[in-house]
Amino acid sequence: MAKSNYVFTSESVAEGHPDKVCDRISDAVVDLFLTHDPYARVACETLATTNRVVIAGEVRGPKAALDQVETVARHAVKDIGYEQDGFHWEKFEFTCHLHQQSADIAMGVDAGTDKDEGAGDQGIMFGYACDETPALMPAPLFYSHSILKSLSEARHSGALSWLGPDAKSQVSLQYVDGRPVRATSVVVSTQHSESVPQEEIREAVRRHVLDVLPDGWMCPEDTFYVNPTGRFVIGGPDGDAGLTGRKIIVDTYGGAAPHGGGAFSGKDPTKVDRSAAYAARYLAKNVVAAGLARKCTIQLSYAIGVSYPLSVYIDTAGTGQVDEDKLSDVLRQLMNLSPRGIREHLKLNRPIYARTAAYGHFGREPDADGGFSWEKTDLVDALRRAF
């Protein structure tokens, strides 16, 4: 039986965290190629360090897109807000090592006269949803993201102009009878101008934390930590080197659900690491939104070049109102889980990925242009009818 009384912790990182800078650049490159060709192939990795950005990977798409990669990378860094001596969007040294996608990989993915499009690689992908928050996301991660988004908005608006782009948060929540009831600790480390006193930073952060957490949830003063080292002036890639794909738990469920191990950013939607994880979240969210379970975990698995999932696993953690085997069958009837079926159902061959690079790929509002389509709950009626 699952524990019902416990403390669970999740963390988030801001758009200016060095790894998130790299995720943003890599996804900006994906969007660039998909803008030129909706069926372009991209696997883009980014390294960022003091005044240097290096991009490497494999692509298949028009040369015109390749010629624009540096411009797109600089604009991504500018949008995040880096204009510091150690990392400035106009001044960093840029190196690009993108080359053509392997023909051996392409032949497994491409459709032919005798086969559908296959998966871009083997792997396992998980999706999860729960009823702890309106976004149907685990509460510790939801509030960790929300704190940093609130601070980022204040920085970009000028309300807290002395904040820097780099920041981290961590929220620990007390659960009673399986439901979150209050925060036991909150940690926020945020980059700042050298002239700002730590007490001013603490009070500004406190206001944003109080705005984000439900009433009465604030942790005790002695477990509210803001810049616990006492100083955070040097940050971003100047403070720590960043790499694409190193924040996969922040990107997903904050440790509250399993992870298949594959990162999302820098990958076009033929890569099932990304598209199948989005599909699994979409299905799990619709199950919970339909009231068929309070929690739902879905695992999908694929083989490179194979055009259908090898397995579909569902676990409602004892909260389900329906038979899980029947639920699995119904979900497979409602959504084609082939790599192409996922892309077509969620309309993933569009430049919608740079916006996913910070504050989570899940628990976001669907956008009018098709962004975050995997957050829609348009299967709810069909699921209810099926049961």
Curated annotation (Swiss-Prot):
Residues reported to bind K(+): E45
Subcellular location(s) of the protein: Cytoplasm
Main localization (coarse): cytoplasm
A Pfam family: S-AdoMet_synt_M
Enzyme Commission identifier(s): 2.5.1.6
Co-factor requirement: Mg(2+); K(+)
Reaction it catalyzes: L-methionine + ATP + H2O = S-adenosyl-L-methionine + phosphate + diphosphate
MF terms in GO: ATP binding; magnesium ion binding; methionine adenosyltransferase activity
Biological or metabolic pathway of the protein: Amino-acid biosynthesis; S-adenosyl-L-methionine biosynthesis; S-adenosyl-L-methionine from L-methionine: step 1/1
Residues at which Mg(2+) binds: D19
Superkingdom: Bacteria
Gene Ontology CC annotations of this record: cytoplasm
Keywords: ATP-binding, Cytoplasm, Magnesium, Metal-binding, Nucleotide-binding, One-carbon metabolism, Potassium, Transferase
Binding site for ATP: H17, D166, A167, K168, R231, F232, D240, R246, K247, A263, K267
Binding site for L-methionine: E58, Q101, D240, K271
Cofactor note: Binds 2 divalent ions per subunit.
GO biological process: one-carbon metabolic process; S-adenosylmethionine biosynthetic process
Record-stated family: Belongs to the AdoMet synthase family.
NCBIfam families hit by this protein: metK
Name this protein carries in UniProt: S-adenosylmethionine synthase
Record organism: Rhodospirillum centenum (strain ATCC 51521 / SW)
